[in-house]
Amino acid sequence: MHANTSGVTRSTMDALFEVLRSSVDNAARKQAAAQLRDLQEREPEVFLQHTYDGIASQQLQAELRFFLCTLVIAFLDESWHNAVPKETQERFLESYVRLLLAEANPPILLARKVSRIVALMAKRGSRRAQLGALPLAIQHVVTSYVSELEKATAAQSHARATYVLLYLHVFLKEMQGCRIGNVFEGVCRACVAPLSGVFSLLPSETGMLEAHDLCLYLFKCSLRTFGRGVFDPAFCHFFLAATWRLAAGLGQDAPDSPNAERRQRLLEYALKTHEATVVFFPSRLHELGISFFVLADEAAAAVPSASTPSSAHDTPEHSIFRLLSAVVSSPVGDVVSEKAVCRALRFFTSLLSAEDGDAFIAHCLQCYTTSMYFAPFLQHIVSAYLADTTTPEALSEWSRHPEQVAAGLDVDMDDETSTMSCAEQLFLALTGSTACAGPSLAAAWAAVNQLLQEGDVGPVTAALHAIGIGYYTMASEDTSSYLGFLRGKLLPLLDPATLAQTSPFVARRVVWLVGMWCESVTGTEDRRAVLSALETVLQHAVATQSVVLVLVALKSTENFVSDNHFTLSDVPPTMVNTVLRTVQELLSRVQSPTTIKGLAGLVHVLVEKGALQSQGDALVQLFLPPALAVIESYESRAANAGGTGASGLGVDADEIGDDEGGADSLSSLNMLLECLGSSLRHGDSDAVIWSLLPCVIVPCTSPTSAATAWVEDNAWELFLVMAQSSRTFFSPAAAEALQMALQHTTRDFGMLPLVFRVVYTLLLLRQDGAEEVVSPAHLEAWMTMLRESLSAELCSAVAAATFAVGRTSAGPLSALLCQHAAQALVLSSDVQSEQYTMPLAMVLALSFASATGGEEQQQLAVHVHAAVQSCAPSGTYSQLLEQLVLLLDVSPSTLVSRALARLLEVLCRTSAAPLAGDDLAMVQRAMEGVAATGGSTASVTGADDEDAEDRAAPEMLLELLGDEDIPQGSPHFARVMRAFAALLS
């Protein structure tokens, strides 16, 4: 019966496998995946045996075996550790190890896949082991691989050793994350001897190239074993000599020989291993001795080329600094690969990052940077890797793709595959070094000055590039030298007559450099001169239709406006209008979201810095068209995706955002929304404000919109600014906005704090009649949220909304608020620590303080008494008073303390029944305490009493409402002061 069931299961699995392998029906594939998961959970051993049988069958097509491996790997990732018994794990691990080592020459991709199965099984199996020993599963794999590798080495079987090294490489790659218990280090230690034995098969450079595959996997294993797992000084010296032998032949292989490519690839891995040693073992590098890095007699030598023949026994050439400088100084492409140069550059950068923590490393670097090698080395880095491409083809890109050309000046410093990026990192590390800054700066300035004097376009762009990125590391406290360079050399080049005669490549770098060094220009006169020059560049570039120069000049202008030295007196009279006209023209022409984001950022900075104050409504019209274009584009794409996708399935926002630079587009939309908000703060038209509701706010906050998932936080921020900046509630759109925000309060999503702030702000804007828009059901839900939410931000926002309801209520909602507040306070088990109690106490205080007379206060008191009585017998009126007194001890401000004291007084005065003497005495002492200290805060605020007394009442009110960032000129600020005036007295 069991065998029959197993057979049925295998047949079912085969059918599911075929669907997953070949079907293009998405629904069918999902159903098959779900059924397979169910079978795997119920009968994991049957699944493992069935897939193993297929993978082990040499009669099955290789692609089918490969597909089965993929299924097994997915199962191992999800279920191996918990769903498969230990005995079964051990059996299948042993089976797969035997399979790997038994098959002589499997297809390389299949061999890699099966070896990954072995690695995952060992990694995800039981990790229990004796102290200092490897887990049994891992030990078994290591022992099997090492034994097989030693047999292949002894037999000098290159083919067999190559396969075993492949298996070992995959295993080491998977194990390198197993650092707990030093598992990875233990695996690497077991590999030291067998790997050393394999190196004996390759005694010469010729042997390495002839046995390229063997050597490649040997280097890959060495990368993890010696570069990341085990520090072995003897190996480091041996491997350096081997690397020199490879480098010595660069550029000497016949053009049609495969050896050239083989040599470069092996050199890349060798350099990667040397780099890893520095990164993983910086504190042990002293064990290598200084001669490993730099030799004393190198000072008089010139920088060699990697293509220069060298003897393996020529000791001076065996220092690693000479090797790396030789690689860096060789022609890229013709002699060395870009990847090899990047790794050589990163080796130096990694050493420099460790110099502060290791005196030996610092000493090695000092020796090198003070040697005769260093200055030519640094000059080559600047001239070869920091120069712009200045060919006619490059210039044609200025008109074809101007936005990409302008953006290309901002190099990705994290790109480890770009020589320019790696050269920038090393240049900055050298000139910013603790131990080597002196000689590095001297060499850097000498190099750039020489390149500038050459006068050729390429070298000049390289020099300007180096100076530009060195705005921090090359700057000094005495800025007179740079200012002289700025006044005497740079600014004259920005004159329109000179620009017309200057290479566009040089002009672009000059404009860029001026912006990069903005922090070194501190005087108003100089800053004004620079901004005037940049304005002139803008006018010239617009006239000559040089979009690249326009974009670079705008970026440099932004640098000056955004830096800490900026003042309004820096701004030339016409600069702002020139910038706005230029931005407006560009926004209608550019296509790159990154460019739009940059332009929006510039205007945003101008607004935030105060350079634009009275043009808010005009700025809205500047940013609205591109914002609408992005929104319309995403709505259209969502509609198309929905039309072509499977029926009944919603559009995946991630898929839309990832397609065709979508995330970048939405990033620019976020910036445009911020700019719209900044503009509204300086506008004065309610019509302009509420015109954004249907075309921007609704499509960017609707749960069904394609853009919402990406921009809703900025959209709700903009919505809040709209409400704060509006002056009246007369616009029909304002009423629509309030209803829309109220509907969103019923959702459970991350924007709720902003939603409630919008509701609170709009209720204050509406001023009265809260009952017309807010229902008792709304209030019930808000009270529940306030009591149950763990988010302080959400509690603050909900509290502000309830304050607004209480202040604008005609009576019924205010009474309901008082009832809820009184009940919650009476029933609180720890009134001082629960975050909702203080807001609810202030709801009571505000309601009584806002009452127009004694009769209205008496009516509220009736509701409070009824609420307390509904809590009987656990809650009493006396307990309510006690809870309020306890809250005084944790009051956050003088304003709150005084409000609570007045609340206690009115509750005592309006009590339906005479209070006990103890209660009266308790309240009296609390009120006297508030009066004696001016209502100062308790120590929980972190401020002393004197500081608390000095705080202005409006400041404390804004803090209570969560409106600390509201400027005094905002219409919302004035409304808050009027609405809550009762708390200010």
Question: Whereabouts are the PLM-identified features?
Answer:
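Karyopherin-beta/Importin-beta family HEAT-repeat alpha-solenoid scaffold
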Residues: H2-S985
